[in-house]
Amino acid sequence: MAAKKSQKVTPLMQQYNSIKLKYPDAMLLFRVGDFYETFGEDAVKAARILNIVLTNRNNGGERTELAGFPHHSLNTYLPKLVKAGQRVAICDQLEDPKMTKTIVKRGVTELVTPGVAMNDDILNSKSNNFLCAVHFGKKNLGVSFLDVSTGEFLCAQGNTEYIDKLLQNFGPSEILVQKKFKKEFNESFGKDKHCFYLDDWIFKIDYSEETLNAHFQTKSLKGFGIDHLEEGIIASGAVLYYLAETRHHRLQHINSINRIAEEQYVWMDRFTIRNLELYHSTAANAVTLLDVIDKTISPMGGRLLKRWLALPLKDAEMIEKRLQVVDFLIKNPEILANIQDQIREISDLERLISKVATQKISPREVNQLKNSLNAIIPVKELALKCNNEALKIIGDNLHSCDLLREKISESISEDAPVLIQRGGVIASGFSSELDELRGLAFSGKDYLDKMIQRETEKTGISSLKIGSNNVYGYYIEVRNTHKDKVPEEWTRKQTLVNAERYITEELKEYESKILGAEEKILHLEQELFGKLIAWMAEYIDPVQQNARLIARLDCLCSFAQQAQAENYSKPEITDSYGMDIEEGRHPVIEKQLPPGEVYVTNNLHLDREEQQIIMITGPNMSGKSAILRQTALIVLMAQMGSFVPARSAEIGLVDKIFTRVGASDNISMGESTFMVEMNETASILNNISDRSLVLLDEIGRGTSTYDGISIAWAISEYLHEHPAKPKTLFATHYHELNEMCETFERIKNFNVSVKELKDNVLFLRKLVPGGSEHSFGIHVAKMAGMPQMVLHRANKILAKLEASHSMEDSGAVLKKSAEDEMQLSFFNLDDPLLEDLKQELLGIDIDTLTPVEALMKLNEIKRMLGNNKQQ
């Protein structure tokens, strides 16, 4: 909103208001002298976000809020504004105030938004900063991702579920949406995204094709392999439109657009990505898989590893190539160490060369680019000497950029500053004109020393001094005791208490030369630096290629280092439908164990013929969920091309990983824990394939016991009878499901073993054949610190209930019900009170019960028994 107006608005505020009207959705940083000022509502927001002083100023009779900061602090305050979700329009002075007698011309030079930023203080070095656009088509949705700081440009299209998965994977900082689809977007993807809404006309195929072809200087998009993706093209066009609107016109580094090939990568929906905690966790300070396996050194390597984690491969040949490189590096630790030593010398090549394209690179960063390219030479030589085909290909394709490195070396000083205004950017010997000017400007001390010596000899004044100030410039200072010796041609300029200051024609001449030289030096350095940057733009493609190859090599070195350190093994990827893991471990839990504690490994076998579904029972806290997660993580790591935490692993290619793990709710969308659970499970059942891996944990826990058992049974039966026969791990504490193995031949029972001691339970965390009959919920309650009285009473009630129920086995009822079309019919008790108690206890979910709730429940049971005695 523009600042408050009145009939007597000052010319400065008139100018501010006219510019603000063009950017109503952005905070306007308005350059006034040495400060960036904000006014009105912008000032209120800025003061709150930046914790700076909010004041008022008189604006033609009105009071206007004002908050500002020094212009040189822009890089300190701008990131804070953008990270707070603000779109920031930077309005600069477009002319020198000294050169105009009227108000200084001003204009917006850049619009910085959460998704469009080049500032290093805004960006995370190991994460992409994606701007995204989503287009709602008639049949499909289109999506596009662009990181303006690296030049990566991607697009895809598909159903809502696929786009949702991509949004989860790529985590865009800002999403562009058509205004009329705001409601649909919120319903499909939630309200927690940072969105900006654009006019409908932007989302048209003709406009988008024209925009993309104009940008890439092509006549067709066939060469990029996206010509058939109409919705994806429309989304991509919207992204380029937004860049133009935000004053980002220098985009030479965005020289390609790639399709996200859905068929090349393992499918993981957003629930799976969340449940496996690949790179985010809902728990505070939780360790993710990325935290454990990321041993990358370079920023671009870190970003690529995150992409590999989000998009594991389905192509066995591509996986094997990665594994072979990792295997070679492990067997040749000296080569691994040498390559990593050189990668440490390489800065963020992708973002540095992007700054060349956008002309935002500093002199010091140009040297960083040169040093990074220098470090690539030994990497290239090492890779070419390796007895590994994939590494040789990397070596072949690394560009030495000889001319670029040479040009930077001869033109830029080794100790070049960050800001060109500080001078000393261009190396000596590069420009004879510059060297001559520097000789004049910086040989001043010698010249002045000679002048003092000469004038002292001529006048006989031994205490002569030459100095300068902003008012009088250069002067000769003579003490009062010697002023009678001053020559007549000297002109007195200033009288002090003990001295007089004079100027001479020679000194005036020298001063004009010095001042002119310094100004010319700055101008010439800026001109030469600008020409160098324009020339360097010719190397955008080869430097980007180097960045991609170094990132790839960095990831493979990271895999090798991790495998060495943690004793991982090379997985065998096959075309079979089975899975055989020997002594598998959970990579994250293993790293968090106390010193000296050994991780309990587990074997696991799945196939389509005999052991398609493993039903895992066992007490709470025994490690059922860990076994499920570690299986998924081992498969995922293997198909990334990494070694895995197991003694051995033979894995038939998996094309989809589904997980339903842990309880959560979605209150903001009006969904209960059970509704969320059913939504996620329905998504799994509707998308399974013959190469799917399905992991289900405690399905049905969010509803009543009978409902839960019925649903869990029916889901297991559905998966068993489905033609795809997906490999499934099903963890449950419904012991009734153990009976399924007698009816369904490919369901096998396993349990996570425990050892019962006199008054305690020891969790062995070992997966063994056979079902478990006990949940040991009361033992878990004891571990949680439940009062002894509650535990004692719970044991008594449990014993009575078990004795009462021994007359008829609930598992047998379930087995019979499966044969009788799932008509559940549980035992009847003659005593109505016992029936009431049974219903009360069966309705208790011990996993979610708090100590206070347990006490209240026991008090209710006691009241029921007391009432019965009185009757």
UniProtKB/Swiss-Prot annotation:
Q: Which InterPro entries match?
A: DNA_mismatch_repair_MutS, DNA_mismatch_repair_MutS-lik_N, DNA_mismatch_repair_MutS/MSH, DNA_mismatch_repair_MutS_C, DNA_mismatch_repair_MutS_clamp, DNA_mismatch_repair_MutS_core, DNA_mismatch_repair_MutS_N, DNA_mismatch_repair_MutS_sf
Listed A to Z, the keywords are: ATP-binding, DNA damage, DNA repair, DNA-binding, Nucleotide-binding
Q: Which GO terms describe its molecular function?
A: ATP binding; ATP-dependent DNA damage sensor activity; damaged DNA binding; mismatched DNA binding
Q: Does the keyword DNA repair apply?
A: yes
Outline what the protein does.
This protein is involved in the repair of mismatches in DNA. It is possible that it carries out the mismatch recognition step. This protein has a weak ATPase activity.
Gene behind the chain: mutS
Task: Enumerate the Pfam families for this protein.
Answer: MutS_I (PF01624), MutS_II (PF05188), MutS_III (PF05192), MutS_IV (PF05190), MutS_V (PF00488)
Choose any GO biological process term that the UniProt entry carries and state it: mismatch repair
State the similarity comment: Belongs to the DNA mismatch repair MutS family.
Q: Does the keyword ATP-binding apply?
A: yes
This one is known as: DNA mismatch repair protein MutS
* One Gene Ontology term, aspect cellular component: cytosol
Q: Which parts pass through the membrane?
A: none
**Which amino acids does the record list as binding ATP?**
G618, P619, N620, M621, S622, G623, K624, S625
In which domain of life is the source organism classified? Answer: Bacteria
